[in-house]
């Protein structure tokens, strides 16, 4: 009989996008409870040890974090299994480096370095808009933030630009055709394109038709779409290598051969 939350995570059951090898142990770091879901997050220990190679093991990661060198969205974090997720800004003060967690077209979190100016803000997808106690309006974003007194024009599925120093909304983008979006779930995870058409299905899932920079069109659920810019070629955040354009296997092969001069 289960009593309370699980405290362990087997390595084979861990999300594949963490890219942990099977033979390095039985267990994987289980993310703490936090702003992102377990399968949509990346524990800081995996980011520092496996991706950046700044530590050899978990003990070294703990030593780095207990010296308050690591910040997520402008706040010092000392929990090695803190779940960082999509659009989070990770700052390493000792090396003066800033990273934003965004997906590449392979569906994995890219190690994407950003400037100090870009690290001052993040984008958040509005999940719901409601009235609280005493009629105070508020919005809830994809990373669990509750922001009171938003602009009355903001609706669900819009994207807000959040100042990390104050936690307030600086600007927002309406969800509409012609907007630049990134896909955050499903088989098209990490692809970037422009909204062409929205299909409404009563009692089902709304679908969004998206066209990428190579004029390829694909369809995904509305819940997987995250607006990142007002129009094509003008994202509000910098994109990782590949710019969210997914190539076929043959196209990848041809590009690789061209780089090798074959």
Curated annotation (Swiss-Prot):
CDD domains: KOW_RPS4, S4
Cellular component annotations (GO), alphabetically ordered: cytosolic small ribosomal subunit
UniProt keyword Cytoplasm, yes or no: yes
PROSITE patterns: RIBOSOMAL_S4E (PS00528), S4 (PS50889)
Keyword Zinc included in the entry's annotation: no
Domain KOW: 178-211
A GO BP annotation: translation
GO MF annotations, alphabetized: RNA binding; rRNA binding; structural constituent of ribosome
Superkingdom per UniProt: Eukaryota
Localization: Cytoplasm
Keywords: Cytoplasm, Ribonucleoprotein, Ribosomal protein, RNA-binding, rRNA-binding
Pfam families hit by this protein: 40S_S4_C, KOW, Ribosomal_S4e, RS4NT, S4
Matches recorded under InterPro entries: KOW, Rib_uL2_dom2, Ribosomal_eS4, Ribosomal_eS4_C, Ribosomal_eS4_central_region, Ribosomal_eS4_central_sf, Ribosomal_eS4_KOW, Ribosomal_eS4_N
Domain S4 RNA-binding: from-to ranges: 42-105
Family matches, as SMART domains: S4
Self-association and partners: Component of the small ribosomal subunit. Mature ribosomes consist of a small (40S) and a large (60S) subunit. The 40S subunit contains about 32 different proteins and 1 molecule of RNA (18S). The 60S subunit contains 45 different proteins and 3 molecules of RNA (25S, 5.8S and 5S).
Function: Component of the ribosome, a large ribonucleoprotein complex responsible for the synthesis of proteins in the cell. The small ribosomal subunit (SSU) binds messenger RNAs (mRNAs) and translates the encoded message by selecting cognate aminoacyl-transfer RNA (tRNA) molecules. The large subunit (LSU) contains the ribosomal catalytic site termed the peptidyl transferase center (PTC), which catalyzes the formation of peptide bonds, thereby polymerizing the amino acids delivered by tRNAs into a polypeptide chain.
Family (UniProt): Belongs to the eukaryotic ribosomal protein eS4 family.
Protein name per its UniProtKB record: Small ribosomal subunit protein eS4
């Amino acid at each position: 009989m289960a009593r309370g939350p699980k405290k362990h995570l087997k390595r084979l059951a861990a999300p594949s996008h963490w890219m942990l090898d099977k033979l390095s142990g039985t267990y994987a770091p289980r993310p703490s409870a936090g702003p992102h879901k377990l399968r949509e997050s990346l524990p800081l220990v995996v980011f520092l040890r496996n991706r950046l190679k700044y530590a050899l093991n978990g003990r070294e990661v703990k030593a780095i974090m207990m010296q308050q060198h690591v910040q997520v969205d402008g706040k010092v974090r000392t929990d090695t299994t803190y779940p960082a997720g999509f659009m989070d800004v990770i700052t390493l003060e000792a090396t003066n480096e800033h990273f934003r967690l965004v997906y590449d077209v392979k569906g994995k979190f890219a190690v994407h370095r950003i400037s100090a100016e870009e690290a001052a803000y993040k984008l958040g997808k509005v999940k719901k808009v409601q009235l609280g106690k005493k009629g105070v309006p508020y919005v809830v974003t994809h990373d669990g933030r509750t922001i009171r007194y938003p602009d009355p024009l903001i609706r669900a599925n819009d994207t807000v630009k959040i100042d990390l120093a104050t936690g307030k909304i600086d600007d927002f983008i309406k969800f509409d055709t012609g907007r630049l979006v990134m896909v955050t779930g499903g088989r098209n995870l990490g692809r970037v394109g422009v909204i062409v058409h929205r299909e409404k299905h009563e009692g089902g899932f709304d679908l969004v038709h998206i066209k990428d920079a190579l004029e390829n069109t694909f369809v995904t659920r509305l819940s997987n779409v995250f607006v990142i810019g007002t129009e094509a070629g003008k994202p509000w955040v910098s994109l990782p290598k590949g710019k969210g354009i997914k190539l076929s296997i043959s196209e990848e092969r041809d590009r690789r051969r061209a780089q090798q001069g074959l």
